[in-house]
Amino acid sequence: MNVSNNAGIDSNDLAKRGESLIRKSTNRYLTTVRIAFRAKQRRFDDFDGLLEESTIKPVQRSIIELSDEQDQPDLLPG
């Protein structure tokens, strides 16, 4: 993850990750819904104080997480 500004990550890296998620998916709509659902979960986790304070927005974090899960499935538990 490349840090480029105070707000979080490199926008080019984020765009490439998002494009990769969409390109590798069989259903663009479901991928978009997964990103939105994960972002909503992260937002509530942040609100409840369960996660450390982050400068990365929930949608950005969800794209990064889903991209990492897609690219490196061996990192997933189970």
From Swiss-Prot:
Signal peptide: none
Any one GO cellular component localisation term in the record: DNA-directed RNA polymerase complex
Keyword Transferase (UniProt): yes
Enzyme class: transferase
Gene Ontology annotations of biological process type: DNA-templated transcription
GO molecular function, one term: DNA binding
InterPro entries, sorted: DNA-dir_RNA_pol_omega, Pol_omega/Rpo6/RPB6
Nucleotidyltransferase among keywords: yes
EC number in record: 2.7.7.6
Highest taxon listed in the record's lineage: Bacteria
Entry's family note: Belongs to the RNA polymerase subunit omega family.
Function: Promotes RNA polymerase assembly. Latches the N- and C-terminal regions of the beta' subunit thereby facilitating its interaction with the beta and alpha subunits.
Assembly information from the UniProt record: In cyanobacteria the RNAP catalytic core is composed of 2 alpha, 1 beta, 1 beta', 1 gamma and 1 omega subunit. When a sigma factor is associated with the core the holoenzyme is formed, which can initiate transcription.
Listed name of the protein: DNA-directed RNA polymerase subunit omega
Species in which this protein is naturally found: Prochlorococcus marinus (strain MIT 9312)
Gene name per UniProt: rpoZ
